[in-house]
Amino acid sequence: MRLHHLLLVLFFLVLSAGSGFTQGIRSRRSCHRNKGVCALTRCPRNMRQIGTCFGPPVKCCRKK
């Protein structure tokens, strides 16, 4: 029974540690705070993607 508790704690630890490595920019507001703009398709050539604005299809882009 103790093994189950240990595995459960380990599972939650892995989940919480993994969430810190995702992209931090996920809204229009945070994109603009990081000096980015939202692009519907892909980022223009002079910009690079730094996150998403409303979900996977809308990208947050910033100058290189």
Curated annotation (Swiss-Prot):
S-S bonds: C31-C60, C38-C53, C43-C61
UniProtKB keywords: Antibiotic, Antimicrobial, Defensin, Disulfide bond, Membrane, Secreted, Signal
GO cellular component: extracellular space; membrane; microvesicle; sperm midpiece
One Gene Ontology term of the molecular function aspect: CCR6 chemokine receptor binding
Propeptide: 21-26
GO biological process: one example: calcium-mediated signaling
Signal peptide (from-to): 1-20
Predominant location: secreted
Domain of life of the organism encoding this protein: Eukaryota
Pfam annotation, one family: Defensin_beta
Localization (cell): Secreted; Membrane
Function in brief: Has bactericidal activity. May act as a ligand for C-C chemokine receptor CCR6. Positively regulates the sperm motility and bactericidal activity in a CCR6-dependent manner. Binds to CCR6 and triggers Ca2+ mobilization in the sperm which is important for its motility.
Family the UniProt entry places it in: Belongs to the beta-defensin family.
Subunit structure: Monomer. Homodimer.
Name of the molecule in the record: Beta-defensin 1
